[in-house]
Amino acid sequence: TATVFVGVNSGFNHLIRPMFYDSYHKIENLSNPKGPERIYTVVGNICETDTFAWDRKINEVREGDILVFRNAGAYGFEMSSNFNSRLKPAEVMVMDGNVHLIRKRDVFEDLLKNQIEVL
């Protein structure tokens, strides 16, 4: 059978652990939680080895669906980077079924704020 890829609006610059350590993060489709399960390879938007999961059962994914990567934890942010001038995403914590924003996403000015004018 053919490999079916799901491309997400993220990359290893946001969660590098799967690439470095082959770490497992459960991926769920929040937009279609009761859809039929399909087998997907989930890839990011960076031009390097940017694969989050191979041959993973996920409820059917459609364009625009929101996927969650479970248990990214503190290492998600601490190991993230602005590789290829990509902005860091917001972080949310789910506790007792409630979603809490715990870190705002970067804005373009965040990429430039520590640069020093040389010339």
Sequence positions of predicted segments:
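Charged (often Lys/Glu-rich) extended helix/loop segments that serve as interaction or gating elements
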Residues: 1-119
